[in-house]
A protein has these predicted regions:
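Helix-loop boundary and gating motifs at the non-cytosolic
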Residues: 12-78, 239-246
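Hydrophobic core of transmembrane alpha-helices in multi-pass small-molecule transporters
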Residues: 39, 120-137
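Helix-to-loop junctions at the C-terminal end of transmembrane segments
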Residues: 80-93, 182
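C-terminal ends and interior cores of transmembrane alpha-helices
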Residues: 102-118
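Transmembrane alpha-helix termini and helix-breaking/packing motifs in multi-pass membrane transporters
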Residues: 173-193
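Symmetry-related core transmembrane helices of the 12-TM Major Facilitator Superfamily/SLC fold
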Residues: 189-206
């Protein structure tokens, strides 16, 4: 009996060492809301490609078409993600995310309707790239952690690690979930993904206290144009780098 108690105590101690730091971060005010919200809103990343593949094969009986559409969405995502990230830095998280989400929702509804009604293939080609209109939730979440924990290197590293854990969980859950729902109904899979986007976005974007300021806001507060502000910050970074290297 004592051996079992010792094993249980050891497991508890290891779990505390591994997850205790994460729990501490999530107990901080406002952090659980935006962290969990970002994961929920990220569900299109693992789910859309699988949903397109299974739905197109079901309605069109063509794996080649499904593969091409999935590739188009992936390429569009690779192009749009850094561009959206840059816009977020310039104009702010809410200012960029809200119109981006609206584009995604309209595109998802249009593509789902087109697939279920067996629309001409060219319609699918035109609509699919717009499903890459996904805000960079992971990057925005990490930006919030970095801003909140500025100066605390240890907890910042732990927070970024936690963000990585959440990302992995999203992919582990999202792919099989998308497969299951899409086999039942492509409409169900897209609808579920859309609900995740709306719920996650509301959780994340309505948490205003942790949102970092955009370059536009910082420049306005400094009485500078955005270009002047960027040049000033670049000069500061150069001076800091010179001091560190000297």
């Amino acid at each position: 009996m004592s051996n079992n108690a010792n094993v249980a105590a050891a497991i508890k101690e290891v779990a505390h060492k591994v997850f205790g730091g994460y729990a501490e971060l999530l107990r901080m005010p406002h952090t659980a809301r935006f962290s969990i919200g970002s994961v929920i809103a990220c569900m299109p990343f693992p789910m859309v490609g699988m949903t397109i593949t299974i739905s197109v094969q079901h309605y069109y009986g063509n794996y080649s078409l499904a593969g091409v559409l999935t590739a188009i969405q992936a390429i569009a995502l690779a192009v749009s993600s850094p561009l959206l990230g840059k816009l977020v830095d310039k104009f702010g998280q809410r200012q960029v995310s809200i119109p981006t989400i609206l584009v995604w929702i309209v595109a998802a509804i249009a593509l789902t309707t087109s697939i279920t009604n067996r629309a001409p293939v060219w319609v699918l080609y035109c609509l699919t790239p717009f499903l890459a209109a996904i805000p960079p939730w992971g990057a925005m979440s990490r930006a919030r952690w970095t801003t909140m924990l500025k100066g605390d290197r240890e907890r910042t590293d732990r927070a970024l690690s936690l963000s990585g854990v959440f990302d992995e969980c999203m992919w582990i859950i999202g792919n099989p979930l998308a497969s299951t729902l899409a086999v039942i109904s492509g409409l169900l899979a897209f609808s579920f993904t859309g609900v995740c986007v709306v719920i996650g976005a509301l959780m994340f974007l309505t948490e205003l206290t942790t949102e970092p300021k955009s370059q536009t806001q910082l420049a306005r507060e400094a009485g500078l144009t955005r270009e002047e502000y960027r040049k000033r910050e670049a000069a500061k970074a150069d001076r800091k780098s010179t001091r560190l290297n000297s």
